[in-house]
Amino acid sequence: MRVNRIKQKLKNGEAVYGIMIKEAHNVNIAEILEIAGYDYFVIDMEHAYYDMSDIADILQYARKTEITAVVRIPRLDYAYVAKTLDMGAEGIWVPHLDTVEEARNLVAFGKYPPEGKRGAAVPVFRQKERQEFKQAADYFRAVNEETLLIAQIESREAIANVEAITAVAGIDVAMMGTQDLSLDMGLPGQGSHPEVKAAIQRVVDACRKNGKASGNHIPGIDELRYWTGQGMRMITHSYETNLIIEKGREVLKALKG
């Protein structure tokens, strides 16, 4: 069975580095990002214009490479979680996860029984993997073990509940949503404000206490380095569009002298 490489690295205490995509639709984006050296990429269905048919081919292609494909779904919903996993996603990232009940529902939707209530399915791309197991129970247990579940923390309510959220069995990562958190705190765009940083530190500390990984998704390299130094281990840098824009400007500046 295919190993979820970033989940394994996180379990081993290692840091993993990824990028979010919002415009790329060609399946080769997976291989391009793999060649660039990323551990994973995240398909953004919350803010970008992807639907289920758009992401299916990208997810299938990614499974032929060594990069891990994660999907940020639009909201916590059984159909989004189960169908995206059935299409080949190795991780589910849920935005605006604020409560313990929502964390438990994410686990219920994303895991087969007895850990959850995900409906049994063996998609075509998993047929060979299924044949590796004599017992169905062993197969479904293995799939559960390789599924990464990410709760995005981006409100004052979520910060207040973060210790309990990260204590939920099956939640692997608490991912910061710094922009939305700063908005909710009345400090829009001030990710480095002392109050915002203190709130983010609560997430890092809760994850450390409960044996989970913490992460962040922001464009600032210096900020990401700071939080890596504080113990964050799932580092999602910006978007593929920003990468192209920034590199393009850099190259043109050099060419024009």
How would you name each of these model-derived features?
Residues M1-A69, L76, A108, L149, ...:
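Conserved N-terminal beta1-alpha1 strand-loop-helix module at the mouth
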Residues M1-M20, F133-E145, Q201-R202, R208-K209:
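N-terminal amphipathic alpha-helix/helix-capping segment at the start of soluble metabolic enzymes
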Residues E31, V71, L76-E90, V94, ...:
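Catalytic cores of alpha/beta
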Residues M52-D86, A108-G116, R141-N144, S192-G215, ...:
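Alpha-helix-loop-beta-strand connector modules within alpha/beta enzyme cores
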Residues I58, V100-G116, T228, T241-G257:
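C-terminal helical cap(s) of enzyme catalytic domains, especially alpha/beta-barrels
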Residues A79, G91-A169:
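Conserved anion-binding
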Residues A89-G91, Y112-F125, D184-A198, S238:
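Glycine-rich tight-turn/loop motif centered on a GG-T
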